[in-house]
């Protein structure tokens, strides 16, 4: 089934991308000894696999083309999604998304988590004011407490976003529950649903802080 960009799910759907290439790269991301350059490259690769799956049901439209052998009918995307990485960590997923969706518009949401309350605080918001029912891909490597993702999705809803698809490498059950209960996202694609959060809101077994591991603060 393919969906128009304005379609909203009555209940958030959750898809775990179960594939050997995804699992192998996830193992490398989890490994403590993986150095920053490799971590960034592997994050880009696994993000490409996830975005590929996240766009599987995107609406398409027929288009007439000419091949070297004659005319035929192909397809194009009915409406190119808007891509919104959640800063900082989501920046590492952006190149992969734009590699597959080169015509996509990009918005940025920068959120910092208060380590005491675990609530997000926005320091950047360049989401287009009127998304006009456009589908949006939210990129964030980690769905932990879910607060940052819910905050981002609500900003998108306020800008009249259509179908919101969240793309995460790792997800905690608590974060999935928070996102689902908020009603702010339509679909979640993730490479793994991990065991739980620890007492300071980090995913277990997880991979540490995805932002720090990309940008040299860990």
Predicted features, each with a name:
Residues 1-218:
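PRPP-associated nucleotide enzymes
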């Amino acid at each position: 089934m393919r969906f128009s960009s304005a379609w909203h799910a009555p209940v958030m759907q959750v898809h775990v991308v179960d594939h050997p290439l995804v699992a192998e790269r996830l193992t490398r991301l989890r490994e403590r000894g993986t150095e920053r350059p490799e971590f960034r490259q592997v994050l880009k690769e696994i993000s490409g696999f996830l975005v590929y799956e996240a766009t599987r049901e995107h609406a398409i439209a027929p288009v007439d083309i000419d091949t070297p052998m004659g005319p035929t009918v192909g397809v194009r995307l009915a409406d190119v999604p808007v891509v919104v990485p959640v800063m900082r960590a989501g920046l590492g997923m952006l190149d992969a998304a734009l590699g597959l969706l080169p015509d996509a518009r990009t918005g940025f949401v920068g959120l910092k988590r208060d380590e005491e309350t675990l609530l997000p605080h926005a320091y950047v918001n360049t989401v287009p004011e009127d998304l006009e029912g456009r589908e949006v891909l939210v990129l964030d490597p980690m769905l932990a407490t879910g607060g940052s993702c819910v905050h981002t999705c609500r900003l998108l809803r306020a800008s009249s976003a259509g179908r919101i698809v969240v793309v995460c490498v790792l997800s905690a059950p608590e974060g999935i529950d928070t996102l689902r209960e908020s009603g702010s996202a339509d679909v979640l694609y993730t490479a793994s649903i991990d065991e739980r959060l620890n007492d300071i809101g980090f995913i277990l077994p997880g991979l540490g802080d995805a932002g720090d591991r990309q940008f040299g603060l860990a």
